[in-house]
Amino acid sequence: MQNRFGDTSLPKIVIIGGGFAGLELIKKLNNLPYRVVLIDKYNYHTFQPLLYQIASAGLTAESIAYPLRRKIGKYPNIAFRLAEVTAIDKTQKKVITTAGEFEYDYLIIAAGATTNFYGNVNLETKTYTLKSIPEALNMRSAILQQFENAVLQAAGNPDKQKLNFIYLHK
């Protein structure tokens, strides 16, 4: 962390999450007297409103992903680390990740949301969520596989149930 920043006496801010909130915050912190590290498990920002287009093969994954290093590279006081957060030590003010530990004076957790299945194990194991590019690609693959399975059925007797899909959006 020290090699990117000239003045190591500046307060350290660690931001967990490179989504909309995390990126908006780094824009605001640009050129302010802080050393900022953005940590995300992906090296790209996903434009989530278009994930359904990836799942339905309307767009490619690259068209809704923006490299975080490209965005952050122009900000002299901000660095990016590709890592997953494994723990936060509030006493020692450290974020423990798969890429090491990061000390902070201020910690911002902007890691996004997870799907709440409300304890329904059937929903959790038999549905697809749509919060990331890998999940959208998994959904696309499952849909295409169902079409392939239906085509393989005996001629004139397609398994129509294999072609039923339900998309729920709240």
Regions found by a protein language model. Give the residues of each.
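FAD-binding core/adjacent interface of flavoenzyme oxidoreductases
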Residues: M1-L10, I78-I166
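Beta1-alpha1 glycine-rich phosphate/pyrophosphate-binding loop at the start
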Residues: Q2-I78, K160-H169
